[in-house]
Structure formats: structure tokens, C-alpha cells
């Protein structure tokens, strides 16, 4: 047995034992940092900023454009569209339950939701602002934001730091508890179907929980190489290894094709799948993961059972509605 096969076998065994003995329900409240306690005023401001396209250079792209809370927290596109019709090389991850991630972005380059909120605004492809100084100047020019920031942070408080704190505070309210799975592990054994229970058992048995662990099924703070096992057919078809992943951030060869483990919460409604959005169906994604991560060939029935279980991870979504944005009468976005 090769060292890699031995390692994967150990992960499978550890994953199947730990997951089977420690199924966790999703908390109703997300953790928050000491320097940014959640308040209703921050959440209100954050929701408005999140939906305001004027944080982009063209006035056409908001956070919600790619991470739509009216959907599964993303945009169901392989690659999201930013300013001037540009597209990036990665699929937008869901914002729902992102508060349970220890790091953000596919490559983990942001250590917090606050850090993450700062990035897309000045990304030339995504929202295209030249600098946060320009963002702050634009916010200060919109009269309604003065009062909103003052209620959330005090007088003369429009700043990059406070804007990102407000967006993060809003994102920490985007929690989807009470899925059939959550109800099941809390004791309601009728909450999941027999097929979903079989899929849950198979998920643990083959070692999926070696990476997708914890209440959010995201292996909090964990990076994993993908793919572990090379497969010429899948690689040629889906081009998984074209993007170097975390190595793009660290510049370390040892981090090549390593990725933050994504959440499986609400996975049934967040197609397409993988970092490049190349796989259209959940059935195909399960088949690929079993083969390329665990070196397992699953039958159609086993795939169907696991997919049924993953559908049981779709939670209850808090009601969302588009907020009224502060008006800028008589002016345009330049």
C-alpha cells in the first residue's frame, strides 16, 4: 500500500468513526469577534451596504449580485460576473452560514468575515473600485449613510473598518438551522427519510466526514488537497487542477491545489459545484468526490442515497427582503 493510500485509509477510518459519533446540529447563532459585537443597527447598515451597487465602480454590482440571499447565497453561475461584464475563474461560494467558516474565500486568504468584506470591492474584476478611499468618499457623498453609520458606530464614523464590520454583522445573521438533518440529530427520528438515513450512514462509512466535519460540514479552518487521486478523465473534462488554489496566496508549491473545505449546508441548491463551477449536478459531484478524494467507485444507488442525505442539509432560511437604499437625487455614479 502506498503512503498516500495509507493516509487516505486512515482519514476514512477516522472520519467514519468521528462523524458517526458526533453528528452536530447547526447553532441558531453565529460566533462573533469581541471587537465587533452584533447590534441591530450594524445589521441594518450592513444589509444596506451588502445590497448597494454603488460600492462598485460602475454602480451595477453589489455583494448580493454574486451572493444572492434570495437564492442559496450565490448566483448559480459557474463564474460570477463583475463590473463591465468581466468574469473571474472561481465559483461564488455561498454566504449562508459563512459565519461558521474560520477562513474565507476558496483559498482561505481572508481570516474573518470583516477581512473578506473588504476584498471584492477593490477587486478589478468583481466590483472595480480603485481604493477604499474612493469607496469612503462615495459613501460620505450619500447623505442617508451619515445617519446610518452614526446610529451603528457614532458620529463621523464612515470608514472602511466600520463598513466591513457592518457587512460582517449582517452576514452573521445569515444562518439556516432546523434542516431535516438538524431535527433528526436532535431526536426527531421521523425528520429524515429512510433513504436519507442510509445516505448519512454511507457518508460516514466511506469517510466524507474526514474533511466535511462539524456542524456546518466544512471542517472548520481545514484545507484539503483536491484532487488527492489523479483521474485523467475527470481532470480533462472539468479542468480541476488548472487553478493552483491556496498556492496562489502563499506562493508555496506544497499548497498547490489545496482548498478551504466548503460547507455542505444547503448544497442541494447551490449548483454548480467545485471551485471552478464546472460540475452541474450534485450526483456527478458526489461521484467525483468519492473517486478523486477517497478512491471509491460508488454505485448509482449509493450516490442517490448520499445525495438524498445532502438534501436533508437544506435548512430554514430567515426571511429576506431588499432594503431601501439611501437616495442620491439628481446625481449619477461616475
Model region roles, listed by residue range:
Residues 2-20:
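Gram-negative bacterial Sec-dependent N-terminal signal peptides
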Residues 23-119, 182-287, 294-296, 321-334:
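Short glycine/threonine-rich turn/loop motifs
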Residues 106, 128, 138, 156, ...:
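Short capping loops/turns at secondary-structure boundaries
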Residues 113, 127-128:
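Mobile amphipathic helical/loop "lid" adjacent to a hydrophobic cofactor/ligand pocket
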Residues 121, 125-126:
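Class I S-adenosyl-L-methionine-dependent methyltransferase module
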Residues 127, 145, 173-176, 180, ...:
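Short His/Asp/Glu-rich catalytic/ion-coordination signatures at enzyme active sites or charged loops
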Residues 132-177, 268, 278-334:
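C-terminal capping alpha-helices of c-type cytochrome domains
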